[in-house]
């Protein structure tokens, strides 16, 4: 199973480290840093990391990856998007500089929790996973949502949602060392991986 991670900007190394941590226990998992369309072609599933959404959008568009992500996702490739990644895959980004891929029926408000100094950590309860210590850094907020499964909420707003093969969250699961969300994502398909996560 080849797990692709968009590798231009943001928490790329942190996601790579988490997937490699899982691969040490479960054979057959490889990590690919996606910088070209050809890299995406070799991927069974995809992680779009947090970072700066306008920068990531510009680069994946320039390298022909943006439209390819949409095509592969609509064909069923599992996609996990965190923070800025969630902005990119949303239906409405509320930012003309970053057109959403419309892979998740959510409307986003960027940097809703404030600036870097307003970042915070808190425990959340995730359906099917359990308690998770979530790190929110200049996090977006899901203002509105349609046909998605809300897996976790905070202060009345969804912070993790799923629709079929698409998983999105406003926080950074790669910054905690806890592999449970990545385990859950890998169990969604794309290469026959079976999760051993217990929550």
Curated annotation (Swiss-Prot):
PROSITE patterns: PDXT_SNO_1 (PS01236), PDXT_SNO_2 (PS51130). The active site is at residues 83, 172, 174. Its EC number is 4.3.3.6, 3.5.1.2. SUPFAM superfamilies: Class I glutamine amidotransferase-like. It catalyses: aldehydo-D-ribose 5-phosphate + D-glyceraldehyde 3-phosphate + L-glutamine = pyridoxal 5'-phosphate + L-glutamate + phosphate + 3 H2O + H(+); L-glutamine + H2O = L-glutamate + NH4(+). Pfam families: SNO. GO terms for molecular function: glutaminase activity; pyridoxal 5'-phosphate synthase (glutamine hydrolysing) activity. InterPro entries: Class_I_gatase-like (IPR029062), PdxT/SNO (IPR002161), PdxT/SNO_CS (IPR021196). Gene3D superfamilies: 3.40.50.880. Pathway: Cofactor biosynthesis; pyridoxal 5'-phosphate biosynthesis. L-glutamine binds at residues 51-53, 110, 137-138. Keywords: Glutamine amidotransferase, Hydrolase, Lyase, Pyridoxal phosphate. The keyword Metal-binding does not apply. GO terms for biological process: glutamine catabolic process; pyridoxal phosphate biosynthetic process; pyridoxine metabolic process. GO terms for cellular component: cytosol; glutaminase complex. Catalyzes the hydrolysis of glutamine to glutamate and ammonia as part of the biosynthesis of pyridoxal 5'-phosphate. The resulting ammonia molecule is channeled to the active site of PdxS. In the presence of PdxS, forms a dodecamer of heterodimers. Only shows activity in the heterodimer. Belongs to the glutaminase PdxT/SNO family. This is Pyridoxal 5'-phosphate synthase subunit PdxT. It comes from Thermoplasma volcanium (strain ATCC 51530 / DSM 4299 / JCM 9571 / NBRC 15438 / GSS1).
């Amino acid at each position: 199973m080849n797990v692709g991670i968009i590798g231009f900007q943001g928490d790329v190394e942190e996601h790579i480290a988490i997937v490699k941590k899982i691969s040490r226990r479960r054979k057959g998992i490889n990590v690919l840093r996606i910088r070209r369309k050809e890299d995406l072609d070799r991927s069974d599933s995809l992680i779009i990391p947090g970072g700066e959404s306008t920068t990531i959008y510009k680069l994946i568009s320039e390298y022909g990856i943006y439209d390819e992500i949409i095509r592969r996702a609509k064909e069923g490739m599992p996609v996990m998007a965190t923070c800025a990644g969630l902005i990119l895959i949303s239906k409405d980004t509320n930012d003309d500089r970053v057109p959403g891929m419309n892979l998740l029926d959510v409307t986003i408000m960027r940097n809703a929790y404030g600036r870097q100094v307003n970042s915070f950590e808190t425990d959340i309860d995730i359906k099917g996973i359990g308690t998770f210590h979530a790190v929110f850094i200049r996090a977006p907020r899901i203002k509105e949502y349609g046909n998605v499964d809300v897996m976790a909420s905070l202060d009345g707003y969804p912070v993790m949602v799923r629709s079929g093969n698409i998983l999105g969250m406003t926080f950074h699961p790669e910054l905690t060392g806890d592999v449970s969300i990545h385990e859950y994502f890998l169990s969604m398909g794309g290469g026959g991986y079976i999760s051993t996560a217990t929550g």
